[in-house]
Amino acid sequence: MTTEEMLRLRETRLAPYIQLATNLIGKTRAGGGNMFRHQLDTMAILVDYGYIDSVLLKASIVHDILEDIPEFNHNLLISVDFEGHQVYELVREVTRSPDEVKSEFLTRIYEHGSQNARILKVADRISNMITLGFVNEMEFVSRYTDETERYVFPIAELVNGYMLFELQTLVESRRRYVQDFEKIKSKEIYLDSTNFI
C-alpha cells in the first residue's frame, strides 16, 4: 500500500458503521462465530487485496444488515455520514430480495452489478468459503462449493484474478474436505458393521 493509500485509508471513518454492524452480533453462523465478525472479515479481505474505496469498505461492514435484520431502519444507515446514501445503495445491491432465488441473485450481480457490488460479493464469498471449513453438513458444503464455481467464479473473473485464485483454492480445499469426511464416515460404518460383540 502506498503512503497516499495509507493516508486515504486512515481518513476513512469506519466506526459508525461498525457500531451499526453490532446489531448482527446475535446472528449466528453455521460455521461458528456470528454475522458481526463476518462483516469485519469481509472488510479485512478487501483491504488485504488493496481495496480502500471508502464506500466499498463501509458497505462491507454492514453488507448483511438489511438481509439479516428485516426490521432494520435503513434511514439509520443513510444518515451515518455524507456517504451513507451511497453505502445504503451498495448494500441494497448486494442484498438478495426475499423473492429472488440464489442463482438469479448471483446472475444479477454478474450481469448487472456495479464493479463495487461484484468486488464486495467476491470478498463476501471468500469469507464464507473460509468458514465453510467448520461446517459439518457435507451436502451443504458440496452445494455451496458448486454454487461458488458456477456463479461466483465468473464474477471474480471480472474483478480480480487473485481473488479468483483464492476462491478456486478454497473450492478445491472444501471438496477435499468433503471427500475426506466421506472416507472417514464410510470407515466408521464399516467398523460398526464388523463389530460383533
What are these regions (language model features)?
Residues 1-197:
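Active-site helical microenvironments for divalent-metal-assisted chemistry
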